[in-house]
Amino acid sequence: VDDVLANTPLFSALDAHGAEALRSSLSEMKVSKGQELFHEGEPGEHLYLVLDGKVKLGHGAPDGRESLMAVLGPGEMFGELSLFDPGLRASTATALTDAIVLALGNDQLMPLLEGRPAVAAALLQALARRLRRTNEAMADLVFSDVPGRVAKALMELGEKFGTLTP
């Protein structure tokens, strides 16, 4: 647990006292494969951190199709937009495997951000990385054909979750 947390943007920017305060505010959730953590269109009140397993973020179309936005593994955050924008969830989070996630409510994080600009900066950096990936995906939609986009997605998943075999 501590190894995963130490490598997340939220924890890496905290001193020992702040990290302990944040750790005590987290709620552990065990989710089964296929279980939704939240659904697109619901109000967002928590950010989540994958501790074990894999979670996908998807966006549904009116005709029932789903666009895969991200596959997340241990140490990755999601749902953090709800901390800064009280709007509705823009995606559905579903466990791809049995997973353990940590949840942090908006009301628990905001006091930790006050007086800790390094934590706020780490969150902004995580959001900026996500925006950069979104911009790249938009460019791919415009400039790449379907086989090219599928190949790129498979390569990215392989780099992120694959293991090298001789």
Predicted regions and their residues:
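Polybasic "coupling" helices that flank or enter modular domains
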Residues: 96, 114-166
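Cyclic-nucleotide recognition modules
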Residues: 19, 70-132
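Cyclic nucleotide-binding regulatory module and flanking cytosolic helices
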Residues: 1-33, 82-83, 115
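Short phosphate-coordinating micro-motif centered on Lys-Gly-acidic
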Residues: 37-42
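A residue-level structural signature of the nucleotidyltransferase/glycosyltransferase Rossmann-like core
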Residues: 3, 47, 69, 101-102
